Amino acid sequence: SDVCSSDLVGLLGGMFTLLSLSICGAMYHSGLGWLYFTLFTVLGLFMGVFGSVFNTFAGLYQAKDNDLLLSLPIPIRAILASRLLGVYLMGLMFSGVIMLPCVIVYWIAAELSAAAVIGGLALILAVSLLALVLSCLLGWVVAKLYSRLKHKNLLTTLAALVLFGAYYAVCFRASALIERLLAHLDQVGAAVRGGAYPLYLMGRMGQGDWLAIALVLAVTALLCWLTYLLLSRTFLAIATAKTSETKKAYKEGKAALRSIPAALLSKELGRLTSSPNY
């Protein structure tokens, strides 16, 4: 699994490096270098949340050793911090393979200065932290719903399939969307600046705007603190909540005779609907 993960990270890094090389120069020379960073910020947040949201739910609230750790004289804040570190590193891996090529290509093809270097590194940090915040909030919502639903594994599996479908739909349309973006840079830039000012500030941050760097980092730190405060007040109740599922009683009966392919198919379908990770 480690080899597969490294291959996936390498593949994504190569794809987004090529994307950076293809659009960075045109956007920078059009005076829209900030829009270049804004585009990759959105992609980085999407990938960071997509890559870590399920790990947030399973690793934070459904970890098998939660009961053991909570029974030991370990502060809850220490347990929560260790769980959040794992979630953060997962999100950093997925967002970093997008943001790191974006920043390096900008330094090479557009501008290399102290402000640009600091702004680029700060942008990578901000995106990874915002991905952590969004993953934690989504994981918290999922955990609250999960504790009240029946057929939890089936619903979680369906939700995962929907997210995967949305992800691949975006990937397949990425080239067409980028072509439309490049054809209407001025209109897109005006729309983002007027209707999504925080994203504009993050784009300016990547270019080395000191005011944008200070504002974005301050807001990001505040959001991280509020998220930790929310999780610290609800973690114990959710992590120790007993599920409402009832176990089926075994009833003796005759097993139907099936062919080997049919039996294997039935077994795999059962695993698919009972295990979200599968």
Spell out what each predicted region is.
Residues 12-14, 36-56:
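Long, hydrophobic alpha-helical segments
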Residues 236-266:
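Juxtamembrane inter-helical linkers in multi-pass membrane proteins
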Residues 3-5:
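Short, small-residue-biased leader/transition segments that mark boundaries at the very start
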Residues 70-75:
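Short helix-to-coil transition segments within interhelical loops
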Residues 1, 197-206, 260-273:
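A short amphipathic helical element positioned immediately N-terminal to and/or at the very start
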Residues 77-85, 258-269:
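Alpha-helical membrane-protein architecture signal
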Residues 52-62, 77, 81-241:
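Transmembrane-helix bundle segments that line or gate the permeation/cavity pathway
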